[in-house]
């Protein structure tokens, strides 16, 4: 395997895929990225066996096709510290030989692990398919993920519950998260193709990785899922994840119905007031008391 690519192009792709690699791995191959050079380009893959990220890298000149693995964190840090305008050459003759990286007057060698040891996270059939705009996906995540539980014993709360339902006579795609103390719920119009989807719990790590990738995307994001796995396609990047195997609680039972105590406040002014008052709290939970009067709201 031998190819040449602009440092900026390679760095961007490495940043996307190496992010899923766990820093402390008991399985050595999971600390590596799979590099596959072939006619037409380069493909990078990283996985922790729960999530897999695959990216097709453009603008690569392939002199010799081949496959190898390389330590994700080391490769990323080397490329990150190269000059912005550098051309990066990666050369691996095959077998157990080391991977050579060259850029201008700099060169180094990296140990590799056998390609056959790199795990494949087979997707199986993903029968339910639909698309969301990048803005819709960002909103579903941003307005719910703060409520995801971090308590590992309640594993079924360690993600966002996504399902198709009805609200006010309209069909919607709803995202819900709760940690048992707070609950966040947000809806988008139901995309075409999502009507028959099962309710699924997308894990917290997947949500965080997906949100980072969605920040760079403006086009539609394709979603494909089964009751055990979900795949998001964001341009040249594919993120595939296992789903949490559990039953999300009947959250609607804890939402008050017919509540006539409704208050509307200016969002920015309220957020700024909460931040100022919470700043002087010494308690870990940083509580803020709301005193509500006629046409007034006092925070203390």
Residue ranges and their predicted role:
Residues 1-300:
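Structural preference for solvent-exposed beta-strand-turn elements
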């Amino acid at each position: 395997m031998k190819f040449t690519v602009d440092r900026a192009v390679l760095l961007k792709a490495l940043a996307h895929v190496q992010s899923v690699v766990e820093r402390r791995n008991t399985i050595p191959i999971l600390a590596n990225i799979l590099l596959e050079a072939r006619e037409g380009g380069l493909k990078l893959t990283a996985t922790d066996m729960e999530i897999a990220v695959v990216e097709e890298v453009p603008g690569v000149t392939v002199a010799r096709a081949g496959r190898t693995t390389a330590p994700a964190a080391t490769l990323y840090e080397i490329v990150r510290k190269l000059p912005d305008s550098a051309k990066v050459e990666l050369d691996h003759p095959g077998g157990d030989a080391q991977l050579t990286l060259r850029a201008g007057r700099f060169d180094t060698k990296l140990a590799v692990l056998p390609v056959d040891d790199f795990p494949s996270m087979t997707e199986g059939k993903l029968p339910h398919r639909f698309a969301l705009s990048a803005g819709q996906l960002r909103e579903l995540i941003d307005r719910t993920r703060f409520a995801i539980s971090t308590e590992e014993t309640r594993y079924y709360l360690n993600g966002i519950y996504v399902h198709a339902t009805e609200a006010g006579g309209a069909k919607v795609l709803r995202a819900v998260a709760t940690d048992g103390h707070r609950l966040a719920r947000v809806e988008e119009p139901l995309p075409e193709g999502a009507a028959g989807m099962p309710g699924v719990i997308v894990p917290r790590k997947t949500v965080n990785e997906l949100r980072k990738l969605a920040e760079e995307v403006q086009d539609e994001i394709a979603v494909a899922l089964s009751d055990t796995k979900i795949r998001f396609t964001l341009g040249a990047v594919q993120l595939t994840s296992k789903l949490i195997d559990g039953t999300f609680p009947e959250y609607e039972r804890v939402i008050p119905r017919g509540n006539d105590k409704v208050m509307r406040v200016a969002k920015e002014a309220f957020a700024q007031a909460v931040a100022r008052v919470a700043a002087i709290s010494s308690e870990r939970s940083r509580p803020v008391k709301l005193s509500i009067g006629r046409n007034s709201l006092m925070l203390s």
